[in-house]
């Protein structure tokens, strides 16, 4: 297993055919105390990271060296992301370090952030389950409408009074919208149940989906789907807070508390509908890379251009702090961490580095520690990765490529590429003289 992980990380650094950074499939490294993490190992690694990278430090935990390799890989290729199994909501009471099947009790994240773990109909596990569907709430629209309604109720224009009233209207709108979404998800679930097992031959016949192996091809999937999750999602938390308070939840404590309370309201609805229908409802910090732009276009058309709200091409995802806010990486992590505990349907915290991370991989490890300490469930570390399409150089490129000296739009003479070892005249005639291109290259 360790060999496979090492080779996977090595291949990720090498990239695709021409060194391109592979974006998918997403890789996730699990951080777990006693397995791939200890404070003692962290201190030793930070003290002399060059030795840690070279494998010259004997660590206490068996896989801390793989975490070091994962940090090195992230510093070059953006992945892997990091899953923190010691976050209180990610722990499993049956997990034991001496259990060879302990992976069954470890949470797994699908795709960008979807989390499937808690289960009303069986043991808490990610195995044999998935998300059935989710619907996302447009928080900025609810906030804009709340401010308009509050403004009509308080015509004297007292900003404090209007914002206070708008907050209450907004939270009630969140409750009503979440309730409507929960009913919509149930209606869709009832339709999904009528699908036949033969429509999912691989998943059902191989028992990939828990209980599917018991079904005959023409059986409806029915109760087999009850292990899946139904997500009440949301986007645009930052923009919604700007609509009410004139600033985001990174700089306004009142805005932060309002957004936190809004997600708490969603969780109350989730608990209500878990009891009502006996299904695995959850709150999801929606991965809305496409939907956020669509919502913004719709709202700009309806309400016009509102600074900080509808004046960009997209809404900020879920509870994320806007990357343009003047906060440090540590502050961003601390602001977002409490939301992970109340978005059990899935979440992620991104941080952005502005330098060339490959020259400072210890910074990745230090960020991992902050995420571990602050209770992040799932985190990702982004940084600039430029690639020259001609010579293949990967790193930060300014006006001139540091490898071949090319400027944007320019070509590079073949003679220069040959000197750099980046071009060889392989063809049907010359290949016999050079031997195998792969070996020589």
Tell me what each language-model feature is:
Residues 230-243, 264:
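Contiguous, well-ordered alpha-helical segments that form the cores/surfaces of helical PPI scaffolds
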Residues 1-226, 247, 252-426, 431-434:
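Conserved catalytic cores of very large enzyme subunits
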């Amino acid at each position: 297993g360790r060999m496979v992980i090492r080779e996977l990380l090595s291949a990720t650094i090498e990239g695709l055919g021409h060194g391109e950074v592979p974006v998918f499939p997403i890789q996730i490294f699990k951080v777990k105390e006693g397995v791939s993490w200890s404070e003692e190992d962290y201190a030793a690694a930070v003290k002399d990271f060059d030795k840690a990278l070279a494998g010259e430090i004997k660590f206490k935990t068996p896989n801390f060296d793989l975490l070091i390799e994962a940090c090195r890989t992230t510093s070059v290729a953006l992945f892997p992301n990091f899953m923190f199994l010691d976050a209180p909501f990610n722990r499993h009471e049956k997990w034991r370090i001496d259990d060879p099947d302990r992976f069954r009790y470890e949470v797994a994240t699908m795709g960008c952030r979807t989390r499937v773990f808690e289960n009303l109909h069986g043991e808490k596990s990610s195995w044999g389950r998935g998300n059935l569907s989710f619907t996302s709430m447009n928080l900025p629209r609810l906030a804009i409408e709340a401010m308009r309604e509050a403004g009509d109720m308080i015509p004297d224009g007292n900003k404090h009074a209007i914002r206070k009233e708008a907050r209450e209207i907004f939270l009630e709108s969140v409750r009503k919208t979440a309730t409507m979404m929960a009913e919509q998800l149930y209606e869709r679930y009832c339709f999904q149940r009528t699908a036949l097992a033969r429509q999912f031959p691989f998943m059902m016949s191989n028992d990939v989906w828990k209980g599917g192996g018991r079904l005959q091809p023409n059986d409806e999937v029915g109760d087999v789907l009850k292990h899946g999750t139904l997500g009440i999602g949301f986007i645009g938390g930052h923009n919604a807070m700007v609509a009410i308070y004139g600033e985001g939840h990174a700089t306004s404590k009142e805005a932060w508390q309002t957004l936190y309370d809004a997600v708490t309201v969603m969780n109350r609805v989730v608990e209500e509908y878990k009891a009502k229908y006996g299904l695995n409802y959850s709150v999801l910090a929606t991965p809305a890379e496409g939907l956020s732009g669509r919502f913004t276009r719709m709202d700009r058309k309806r309400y016009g251009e509102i600074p900080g709200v509808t004046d960009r091409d997209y809404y900020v995802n879920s509870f994320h702090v806007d990357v343009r806010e003047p906060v440090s990486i540590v502050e961003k992590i601390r602001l977002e961490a409490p939301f992970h505990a109340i978005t059990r349907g899935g979440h992620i915290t991104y941080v952005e580095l502005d330098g060339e991370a490959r020259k400072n991989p210890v910074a990745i490890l230090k960020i991992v520690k902050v995420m571990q300490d602050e209770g992040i469930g799932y985190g990702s570390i982004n940084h600039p990765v430029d690639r020259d399409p001609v010579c293949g150089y990967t790193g930060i490129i300014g006006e001139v490529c540091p490898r071949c000296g090319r400027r944007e739009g320019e070509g590079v003479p073949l003679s220069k590429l040959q000197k750099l070892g980046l071009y060889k005249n392989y063809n049907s005639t010359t290949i016999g003289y050079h031997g195998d291109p792969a070996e020589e290259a």
